[in-house]
Amino acid sequence: MPDAVKVGFVLFATPARGTLIVFCDDGLKFGATATKALGAAVATVKRAAATAQFKGKSGSALDLLAPEGLKVGRLIVVGAGKAASINDYDLLKLGGAVAGKIGAGDTAVTVVADLPTGAMKPEQAAAIASGIRLRAYKFDRYKTKKKDDENGAANASVTLAVADPAAAKKAFTPDSHVVDGVILARELVNEPPNVLYPEEFAKRAAQLKKLGVEVQILDVKAMTQLKMGALLGVSQGSAHPGRTVIMRWNGGKKGEQPLAFVGKGVCFDTGGISIKPSASMEDMKGDMGGAACVVGLMHALAARKAKVNAVGAIGLVENMPDGNAQRPGDIVTSMSGQTIEIINTDAEGRLVLADVLWYVAQKHKPKFMVDLATLTGAIMVALGTEYAGLFSNNDQLAERLAAVGQSTGEKVWRMPLGPEYDKQIDSQFADMKNTGSRNGGSITAAQFLQRFVDGTPWAHLDIAGTAMASPKNEINQSWGSGYGVRLLNQLVAEYYEAKK
């Protein structure tokens, strides 16, 4: 993984160098270990806090030259807010706040993992460590000249002082694999499209074999034999042929129905013949955020040896305006046998998903399918960049996704489905058309997808506002967010994974 920050756990011992970080609540109270670490400097710190009007608000920080009596060079006090009601996502954000204060010169950092309410539990310390890693990630491999202050926490060695280092490390191990999955998803979204085209994306997904994931790559010949006309129609205008990648993790009981996750992977989307405006078209390298999430999730499940059977499937294409490109007015036949009239070639993601969803439903008979796609601008109009749109034909699955969305901070908002919307995608010439009117655009897109799930319990996550170019936050300073990896990992762990 590209992040170089090192995070470890030790019993507390007063650090003799580097940077010391402690937490306080919104009453400027410290935990017992932090109080011990500060010693006589507590009074000095509180005077400095009063002068700076530092109140201990969650995520805020007071940065000081270490007071007399401390051997470290720098002291940072990070506010934990109302410590008595802190949850795992709050702790993740606190870890991000810690990483955000680490500078390029902070090579040795000690974080005292306690609160006024007591020493952090192993799982809480692990959440802090995960937040540090998530915030420290940055994508700069193509920069040949880097400023000295750009690295921040990326090259730091961070030690968390905890009550039980072995237990904290044990708790952090699976969490760290999930962070790896998030970072992998971010890497894929951030890559330029001349580097990450369908064949290259497929090769990177195939690297999951090292973790025990079975990987099958369907090329154009194989997809033609399967009659994936909807997906192939999108890719026919590109010099880079399309691919479908099927990833299988068999961590559950033999023969048990798998869980299925499907991702839209448009590696670059010009809009095709219905070409997009040039302004911000460069952002369309991220139109494969759904596929990136699925690869990151499969990495997380395999690396932490999840006790579940899971299938990840991604359809990879480029949507280009070549002389061979698909035209408005074309009619394609999907793998399901249903015909689709192309009205707008820029409504291509649903065509890709149509064939991959049908393939997974037919070949793997999953317990449920969740697809992720940067599908519509309409969902951004409706929900902005804080929530993904959730559409589902199954109330239990939708409720579970909403619950883990709240606990992980990767929030979803359920949107309606209904046959009343189908008339917008009725076609005079085919079974359906690939887009309706502007009204309810994200809903009609989901109605379209529902025609290809063959009755399987299914949820569609429209992540157009959350996967890329979303506002930076406490745990992500990257253009690509890796949205969905933590959400779906938690869904699996909480509701479907065999308990030890």
UniProtKB/Swiss-Prot annotation:
Binding site for Mn(2+) 2: 264, 269, 287, 348
InterPro entries listed in its UniProt record: Leucine_aapep/pepB, Macro_dom-like, Peptidase_M17_C, Peptidase_M17_leu_NH2_pept, Peptidase_M17_N
Family under the similarity heading: Belongs to the peptidase M17 family.
Top EC group: hydrolase
Residues given in the record as Mn(2+) 1 binding sites: 269, 346, 348
Single GO biological process annotation from the record: proteolysis
Biological classification of the source: Bacteria, Pseudomonadati, Pseudomonadota, Alphaproteobacteria, Hyphomicrobiales
One GO CC term, this protein: cytoplasm
Record note on cofactor: Binds 2 manganese ions per subunit.
Localization per record: Cytoplasm
MF annotations from Gene Ontology: manganese ion binding; metalloaminopeptidase activity
EC number annotated for this UniProt entry: 3.4.11.1, 3.4.11.10
Chain's role: Presumably involved in the processing and regular turnover of intracellular proteins. Catalyzes the removal of unsubstituted N-terminal amino acids from various peptides.
Active-site residues (renumbered): 276, 350
Entry cofactors: Mn(2+)
Keyword Hydrolase applies: yes
Listed PANTHER family: CYTOSOL AMINOPEPTIDASE (PTHR11963:SF23), LEUCINE AMINOPEPTIDASE-RELATED (PTHR11963)
Protein name (database record): Probable cytosol aminopeptidase
Catalytic activity: Release of an N-terminal amino acid, Xaa-|-Yaa-, in which Xaa is preferably Leu, but may be other amino acids including Pro although not Arg or Lys, and Yaa may be Pro. Amino acid amides and methyl esters are also readily hydrolyzed, but rates on arylamides are exceedingly low; Release of an N-terminal amino acid, preferentially leucine, but not glutamic or aspartic acids
NCBIfam families: PRK00913.1-2, PRK00913.1-4, PRK00913.2-2, PRK00913.2-4, PRK00913.3-5
